[in-house]
Amino acid sequence: LFSYREDKKGQVLEEGITEAGSMSSWIAAGTAYSNHDIEMIPIYLFYSMFGFQRVGDFAWAAGDSQARGFLIGATSGRTTLAGEGLQHQDGHSHIIASTIPNCVSYDPTFAYELAVIFRDGLKRMHENKENIFYYITTLNENYPHPEIPNEKGIEDSILKGMYKIKSINNNKKTKITLLGSGSILREMLEASEILNKDYKIDSDVWSVTSYNELRKDGLEIERYNLLNPDEKPKETYVEKCLKDSEGPILAASDYMRISSDQIRPYTSK
């Protein structure tokens, strides 16, 4: 757990088990910039299974009313809360989030990804005044968090939805491309080691911070190409990332298969 600072100018609401009331408070704070001319940065943390699934209509209303703020789906995923029973195992909150056009959603794994996403959200909502809100899922497992890779454009890649985090090229024969998000990225990293050690198979591992944002980019590029048939077709971000990949592509998340399946049209393998 990271420390936090309470400020007299800020406010912490502990509302208990009342999702509708908590979401209403978040919407009130998220629309204060318009209704009361007071700029606020509301952050609502909840079990990810008890967010969009419980208050989906309120989430849509937040989009309609152009609320700004962060929704944090904590302890997310289906494999990391098995001890608490099926009722806590979220496998579809990101699917519901994808139905709201001005909801920007991410499923990061490491702290530096979360920091980059949060900073961009603050800039877009409170500096650029974009009428969007963020849904970010966070995890409950205890694992090491590496430093941000020292690569040019890494922050932009995180925000676009995916970046290569690991590459093994020891065998030069067979290779596979592994895509993982959230808690499953760590399983992909472990899988790459097993493939290399036990089966002599090389691999590229990509951290997918948002299948939803990758799909949005794909739809935007598809529309542009449709409306501009005389121009050279543009490539989606997924196509740019994976056009030189070798072997089969395996994409996974801790959510329903439809989550990673969103980028299937933009892969060629």
Describe the residue ranges of each PLM region.
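Thiamine diphosphate
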Residues: L1-T99, S105, Y112-L122, L179, L189, ...
